[in-house]
């Protein structure tokens, strides 16, 4: 991944970000223009994956945030969906120190006031729309929060083929800075796996993360199959629902990097 684009993707939210430098502004322009001409070298056939963005979702404990930060995780996810065993309150998330990782809030609701208020309370750098939020909802959030701060989740299994998925990504691209492709047909954290081979050669208008049942045992193969810009771990690194296992976090990063973390 070109370093200027990587810096842009890891910019913080309002109040914590510096003004983008010239190279970062160029990356922003490339993103806004859409298409697949992003200057990104993604891993293929065993090439290095050290520049992948790594997100760890479902964080609730300071000790695990410390572990993730020490291992080089880029983004930490806080789930604001009451039905999830990994849910936290905005106040609890605000009390947790992300140790330099970008703070991502995961929402299944389309209650825009709640999303906006939580983004402020929990000091979120990114907002992940992980439900059936309408385009109108995303457009409003893009105006109030900034489109580059939105991560739009799509489920490849909903589409008859890759081209239909690409068309829907284009439809949402104006109100998203990044996509996340998850397993199943809704929700997340189920442990179901995305078919990486089915995403090989995907033409995406924005950088995208691969999610869905990623574990230390399968993440390297999944990345090499479809070359995402990053990965999102959740249930695959747990000893039980809602409880992350530090040894599995280390094992997953070791599997990705091909060396001890």
Can you describe what each PLM-predicted range is?
Residues 1-11:
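Extreme N-terminal basic, low-complexity initiation segments
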Residues 14-32, 42-47:
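Short, low-complexity intrinsically disordered segments enriched in A/P/G/S/L with frequent Arg
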Residues 55-64:
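N-terminal beta1-alpha1 ligand-phosphate binding loop
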Residues 67-73:
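A short, Lys/Arg-enriched amphipathic alpha-helix followed by its capping loop at the start of a domain
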Residues 68, 127, 179, 195, ...:
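Conserved, mostly hydrophobic/aromatic
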Residues 80-83, 98-210, 215-218:
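Conserved anion-binding
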């Amino acid at each position: 991944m070109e370093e200027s684009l990587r810096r842009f993707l890891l910019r913080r939210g309002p109040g914590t970000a510096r003004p983008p430098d010239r190279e970062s502004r160029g990356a922003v322009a490339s993103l806004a223009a859409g298409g697949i001409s992003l200057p990104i070298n993604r891993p293929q056939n065993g090439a290095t994956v050290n520049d992948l963005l790594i997100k760890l979702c479902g964080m609730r404990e300071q000790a695990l945030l410390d572990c993730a930060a020490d291992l080089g995780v880029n983004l930490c996810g806080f789930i604001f969906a009451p039905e999830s065993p990994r849910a936290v309150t905005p106040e609890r998330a605000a009390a947790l120190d992300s140790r330099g990782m970008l703070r991502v809030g995961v929402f299944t609701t389309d209650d825009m006031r709640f999303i906006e208020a939580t983004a402020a309370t929990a000091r979120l750098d990114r907002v992940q729309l992980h439900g059936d939020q309408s385009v109108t909802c995303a457009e409003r959030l893009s105006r109030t929060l900034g489109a580059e701060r939105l991560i739009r989740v799509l489920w490849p299994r909903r589409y008859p083929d890759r081209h239909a998925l690409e068309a829907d990504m284009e439809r949402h691209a104006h109100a998203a800075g990044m996509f996340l492709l998850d397993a199943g047909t809704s929700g997340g954290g189920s442990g179901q796996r995305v078919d990486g081979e089915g995403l090989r050669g995907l033409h995406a208008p924005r950088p995208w993360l691969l999610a869905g049942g990623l574990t230390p045992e399968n993440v390297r193969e999944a990345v090499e199959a479809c070359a995402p810009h990053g990965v999102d771990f959740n249930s695959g690194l747990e000893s039980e629902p809602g409880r992350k296992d530090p040894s599995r976090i280390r094992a997953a990063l070791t599997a990705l990097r091909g060396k001890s973390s």
